[in-house]
A protein has these predicted regions:
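Charged interaction segments
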Residues: 24-26, 30-144
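Short, extreme N-terminal segment that most often corresponds to the first beta-strand
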Residues: 1-36
């Protein structure tokens, strides 16, 4: 029987976008790459990761046996607004129950960004769960 962990998080990111030449953030470097098990990629590294998903490197978002978490980036069209981006992270991780690892990953992500607000919840079907928000004054996740 498979164990599933369900994750939903959102990060509101502040930033200055003063002109068109300002570079876009590299979200894969800041948050992690997505890994999709249905990709037809025959790249040796990807094949190796698929076999050893529990050892998924830090360049990827947390991974279960059928893929990683996903991310969606919303860019605020109002360039005069300090609230520049909203990042959604979400997914269902099969054969994954390490909520501490998810919490550490989210903390690492938030510490790299200028976070206005951030919250995450993760629920493992084995009965463990956490919900936390980013406390910018303490620069850490604070649980409920």
């Amino acid at each position: 029987m498979s164990v599933w962990t369900h994750v939903a998080g959102i990060i509101r990111v502040d930033g200055f976008r003063l002109n068109e030449s300002d570079p876009e953030p590299n979200w894969d470097e800041l948050i992690g790459k997505e890994l999709n098990w249905d990709d037809d990629s025959e790249v040796r590294e990807v094949r190796e990761i698929r076999k050893n998903y529990h050892k998924c490197s830090e360049e990827f978002m947390p991974c279960g046996s059928e893929g990683s978490l996903k991310k969606v980036i919303w860019k605020n069209p109002d360039k005069n607004s300090l609230a520049s981006y909203t990042v959604s992270v979400f997914g269902d991780l099969r054969d994954y129950d390490d909520l501490v690892k998810i919490e550490k990953w989210f903390t690492k992500v938030c510490s790299k960004l200028w976070v206005r607000d951030a919250v995450i919840t993760a629920d493992c079907e084995l009965g463990s769960r956490f919900t936390a928000h980013w406390d910018e004054t303490k620069e850490k996740l604070v649980g409920n």
